[in-house]
Amino acid sequence: AAPLPRAFEWIDGSAFLNHVILVRKARNAEPPKTLETDPLIYQGGSGDLLGCRDPFVLREPAWGLDFESEVCVVLGDTPIGTKASEAASCVKLVMLANDWTLRALVPDELAKSFGFFNSKPATAFSAFAVTPDELGAAWQNGRAHVRVTSTYNGNVVGTCDAGPEMHFSFYELVQHIAKTRRFAAGTILGSGTVSNADRARGISCLAERRMIETIEGGKPTTPFMKVGDTIRIEATPNLFGAIEEQVVGA
């Protein structure tokens, strides 16, 4: 089971701007004009959170299954109007996530201007969630300066740094979500896909690789995930354990 098998809320940001730019290019969409000033946030399902070894049941391969390697935090009680300068006391735990996404369902959903729903199935989380102080110097100003490694079908496809290029810190994300609401202890807040501009760092989701292939060769050549595929997500320092999942058929 996930550290929290159910949560009051699961809220995911998109704080790595390189990811936003690449994925929007992949669906021929422009980044918002407020990209650097106003965080992107969506609210996912929190009643069914997957554990680090739970298989992912793929009901329709044509939906375009993709993994997304992320860092997330668990909040304590967070008052409405909490500012970034006050948010450190709200962040209680840090862990990893695999924010599964069904890419082929995204364009039609977003075209309706009402956000993600069917394209965001249950999210998986690392075995362990640790207090920020356990990260030592790796926890700086609301960012986890850890290296997130994604291993797809036994091959390392990404070793991305989660700290320096996280444009909006977790504290800034807290300020954004608390603008009009308060949050109960146990709310989970995600960073979005960890992504670096340096292509040598690799990828934390297949959508980025497909976009890079399109930029370089005119079309994507990497398919989305299929039954039998595996994904392993872990961080250095390894405080959270590894998420290791296999895609299975319905």
Question: Which residues does each PLM region occupy?
Answer:
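Active-site pocket scaffolds in enzymes
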Residues: 187-228, 234, 241-243
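Active-site microenvironments in enzyme catalytic cores
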Residues: 1-160, 166-172, 212
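Short beta-strand edge segments in extracellular beta-sheet folds
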Residues: 246-250
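Residue-level detection of beta-strand-connecting loop/turn positions
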Residues: 154, 235-237
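Hydrophobic alpha-helical bundle architecture
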Residues: 160-185, 196, 209-221
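Short, surface-exposed secondary-structure boundary micro-motifs
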Residues: 15, 21, 193-194, 236
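Conserved metal-binding segment of the jelly-roll/cupin
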Residues: 45, 51-52, 125, 183-195
